[in-house]
Swiss-Prot record:
Residues covered by region (G5): 528-530
Protein name per UniProt: Translation initiation factor IF-2
Region feature G3, mapped onto this chain: 438-441
Region of interest (G2), ranges: 417-421
Residue ranges, annotated region (G1): 392-399
UniProt cross-references to NCBIfam families, sorted A to Z: IF-2, small_GTP
One annotated GO molecular function: translation initiation factor activity
Name of the gene: infB
Length: 883
């Protein structure tokens, strides 16, 4: 080991330099100052002295006490006056009593050698640790020196080897040249093979071998010295552990020896020590968990979509929601756990909490799925049938026209003879296939007609020749122009006597729908749905328009389309009518429709037959979705059902966040609207319909019935039969149950009868709207109307001591009654409103004075009546209000 100075060794051990010098002198090492060197032998001598001193101190402690406690007791007396007195009147000597007082003192004296021994023990431990560290440093130094020597040896061997090879090559070259010069001197040299002299190579190899043996001997010598030094230190450490006394009292057993590695239990123990204790300690250490408390904050990458709730953001940062809400309060933002935050606010909060925000697009996965679908549809486009939407006003014969084309009787089966949902059919003709979409004509089905115009190729506008252009006809024209879809006008009912096709052309031309005969681009076809007249011309016009448009679609790959209608079938579950726009829809495909997903269990065409696949422009009913998609949602086929589920759930979450944000924005408005709610009556409705489109149309139409005095609220709207939950909701909210083409199940009917819930069934949307309108009208408060019943003109003014000014009047119109209110008019301007105080004729009080009769009128609390004024008498009448 390297020699240290006394001062450096004192710093290593951790004791003052003066104490180390005194301990060295006590150990017999004298004449050492702070700057003098201290060898390993001196350190071992000092350690041995300190150990002996500690052992001797402990033996002295066993023979003599380490501390002495002295107790001293001092007893004295104290006289105190006795309590109580002598006789009642006698004054005798004062009595006293004696009290013993004992004072105890206790002092403890500690032997100074015990303190010194304790300090010496600490010095020994520090010295042992210092020696162990020195040994480790020496081993590390020896290892490094051995590695460096080995590296130098290898480098030297490599250099000598290269030098020997070069020398041997030079000698061989010289010998070959000498041999070539003497080749012609003798014939034996010509016949013999020229062999180089190996003497130089042999000498070089012997030299190299001698050098290698010398280096190997030096390396072994260094390793033996290091090993001997290490063994000597280990023997000294084992000797230290053997001479150390056993611990007394309740000291820990299995004390670690200096020679043992870290973490290994000692062999020697107390009475219960030994292998069992050692193995127990080993097992306990193995059972310890490896968790370590973080020394610095954990920074997470938090993915933040466009909108996120407070609870979800706290979960992503692995903090409690209360902690995040407190942080938001510090930033001046008040929010609840379910409130949605925008992306910028969430980024600021994440940065404030010490994490790293990562902005993600909420529609990234959705775009990936749609891109995969579009790539799967790449290919050559094939001609496809045109999609034709039939639009027009109600009762203009749209469904009857389609029935005649399809040779079916759909209109007769419609409730009320009107269409109330989109019907989709495809028809085989001589010139090709055509897909027809029949839309409702009633004003309540605006959304259905708009959807029909968006997904169609051609619009057939049906106009009755006897009615002309009606409101829904104008609306259909607007939808077609907004969707930039070509139109074909079918002038229906031309077989009626009062039919006027020219008037239809005139009215449509005012809406910029110009016939071809007038120089426009719109075909006008005269048809009769009942007689079947003009149907071939209509089909020919449709197919001609389709040929001009050159319609085409990819017929292979994943299908995509749009949802026309959805309903809840009791035996089939959620079913959706979809129109395939491209690709091939097959049974077993994974489907994504808006916020719903599923696997296609069955495909059914409009005739009720099951089919295995459906191509472009073919409408089919799909079974197997997880729920009811909304009409108008896009339909795509995806390769992975898991991705479809993730996209559907993400869309639902986006809708939920949007709804929560709208609710939060409406809270401030509600604060002001709550003051008016007591004045406004509310009609609550629960609507259940057979299909999604009908429920949507009925909900919108009923909500539009609201007025300033009565508000109509559709608190729930759904598809399917009326169940118990609908009845319970109507009970809780005091609502009216409306079933549109659906009925209540047995449990719901029983609950309705028990609780007397207002339940109504409708099959025609007219009846539903009309009856709700009548119910609302009955809740309206009647209006008060004023009817003028008489008019009197002031001819003169008299003064009365009792009544003040009395007007002498002539009744010019109607009659003046005493109990009715009056108005005083001057120059046809009302200057006073009040009531009559007296009405007299010839000094007699009367209740009524008719036209053409003079009378005296006293106006209550009004004396400024002048000649020429008019007194108007009127009555208030309650009138029933209607919507």
């Amino acid at each position: 080991m390297a020699e240290d100075k006394v001062r450096e060794f004192a710093e290593t051990v951790g004791i003052p330099v003066e104490r180390l010098v005194s301990q060295l002198e006590a150990a017999g090492i004298s004449g050492r100052g702070p700057e003098d060197p201290l060898s390993d032998l001196d350190k071992a001598t000092l350690l041995e002295y300190l150990r002996k001193g500690r052992d001797g101190g402990e033996q002295d402690d066993d023979q003599a006490p380490s501390k002495i406690t002295l107790r001293r007791k001092k007893v004295s007396t104290l006289k105190m006056p006795a309590s109580g007195g002598g006789g009642s009147g006698a004054r005798g000597p004062r009595q006293t009593r004696t009290v013993n007082v004992e004072v105890r003192k206790k002092r403890t004296y500690v032997k100074r050698s015990v303190v010194e021994a304790e300090e010496s023990k600490h010095d020994v431990e520090r010295l042992e640790r210092a020696l162990i560290e020195d040994r480790k440093r020496a081993e590390e130094r020896a290892r490094r020196e051995a590695e460096e020597a080995e590296a130098r040896r290898r480098e030297q061997e490599e250099a000598e080897r290269r030098q020997a090879e070069a020398e041997a090559l030079r000698q061989a070259e010289a010998e070959r040249e000498a041999t070539a010069e003497t080749a012609g001197v003798a014939d034996e040299a010509d016949k013999a093979e020229p062999q180089p002299d190996p003497e130089a190579a042999r000498l070089a190899a012997e030299k190299e071998e001698a050098r290698r043996r010398e280096e190997e001997k030096e390396r072994r010598r260094l390793e033996q010295e290091a090993r001997r030094e290490r063994e000597a230190e280990e023997r000294a450490a084992r000797k230290t552990g053997a001479t150390a006394p056993a611990a007394k009292g309740k000291q820990k057993k299995g004390r670690e020896s200096l020679s043992m590695g870290a973490g290994k239990p000692g062999r020697r123990g107390g009475k219960k020590g030994g292998r069992r204790a050692a193995s127990g300690g080993e097992a306990a250490k193995q059972l310890q968990h490896g968790f370590a408390k973080p020394t610095q904050p954990v920074v997470r990458e938090v993915e933040i979509p466009e909108s996120i709730t407070v609870g979800d953001l706290a979960q992503k940062m692995s903090v409690k929601a209360a902690v995040l809400i407190k942080e938001m309060m510090k930033q001046g933002v008040m929010a609840t756990i379910n409130q949605a935050l925008d992306q910028d606010t969430a980024v600021l909060l994440v940065e404030e909490m010490g994490h790293k925000p990562v902005i993600v697009r909420a529609d990234a996965l959705e775009e990936e799925v749609l891109q995969d679908t579009s790539q799967a549809q790449e290919g050559d486009k094939a001609p496809r049938p045109p999609v034709v939407t039939v639009m027009g006003h109600v009762d203009h014969g749209k469904t009857s026209l389609l029935d005649n084309i399809r040779r079916a009787k759909v209109a007769d089966a419609e409730a009320g003879g009107i269409t109330q949902h989109i019907g989709a059919y495809h028809v085989e003709t001589d010139r090709g296939m055509v897909t027809f979409l029949d839309t409702p004509g009633h004003e309540a089905f605006t959304a259905m007609r708009a959807r029909g115009a968006q997904l169609t190729d051609i619009v057939v506008l049906v106009v009755a020749a006897d009615d002309g252009v009606m409101p829904q006809t104008e609306e259909a024209v607007r939808h077609a122009k907004a969707a930039e879809v070509p139109m074909v006008v079918a002038v229906n009912k031309i077989d009626k006597p009062d039919a006027d096709p020219d008037r239809v052309k005139q009215e449509l031309s005012q809406m910029e729908v110009i016939p071809e005969e007038w120089g426009g681009d719109v075909q006008f076809i005269h048809v009769s749905a009942k007689q079947g007249e003009g149907l071939d011309d209509l089909l020919e016009a449709i197919l001609l328009q389709a040929e001009l448009m050159e319609l085409g679609a990819v017929a292979e790959g994943n299908a995509s389309g749009i949802v026309l209608e959805s309903s809840l079938d009791k035996g089939r579950g959620p079913v959706a009518t979809v129109l395939v726009q491209s690709g091939l829809l097959k049974k077993g495909d994974s489907l994504l429709c808006g916020t719903e997903y599923g696997r296609v269990r069955a495909l059914i065409d409009e005739t009720g037959k099951r089919v295995d696949e459906a191509g472009p422009s073919i409408p089919v009913v799909v079974l197997g979705l997880s729920g009811l998609p909304s009409a108008g949602d896009d339909m795509v086929v995806v390769d992975d059902e898991k991705k479809a589920r993730e996209v559907a759930e993400m869309r639902k979450e986006r809708q939920r966040d949007k709804r929560l944000a709208q609710q939060q924005a409406a809270r401030m408005e509600n604060l002001f609207n709550q003051m008016k709610e007591d004045e406004v009556n509310t009609v609550n409705l629960v609507v259940k319909a057979d299909v999604q489109g009908s429920a949507e149309a009925l909900q919108q139409s009923l909500a539009n019935l609201s007025t300033d005095d009565i508000q109509v609220k559709v608190i729930s709207s759904g598809v399917g039969a009326i169940n118990e939950s609908d009845v319970n909701l109507a009970l809780a909210s005091n609502a009216i149950l409306i079933g549109f083409n659906v009925r209540a199940d047995a449990a719901a009917r029983r609950l309705v009868q028990e609780n007397d819930v207002d339940l109504h069934y409708y099959s025609v949307i007219y009846d539903a709207i009309e009856q709700v309108k009548n119910a609302i009208s009955g809740m309206l408060e009647p209006e008060l109307e004023e009817h003028i019943i008489g008019l009197a003109e002031v001819k003169d003014v008299f003064r009365s001591s009792k009544l003040g000014a009395v007007a002498g009047c002539l009744v010019t119109e109607g009659a003046v009654r005493r109990k009715n209110p009056i108005r005083v008019l001057r120059d046809n301007v009302v200057i006073y409103e009040g009531e009559l105080e007296s009405l007299r004729r010839h000094k007699d009080d009367v209740t009524e004075v008719k036209s053409g009769t003079e009378c005296g009128i006293g106006v209550k609390n009004y004396n400024d009546v002048r000649i020429g004024d008019q007194i108007e008498c009127y009555e208030r009448v309650e009138v029933r209000r209607e919507l």
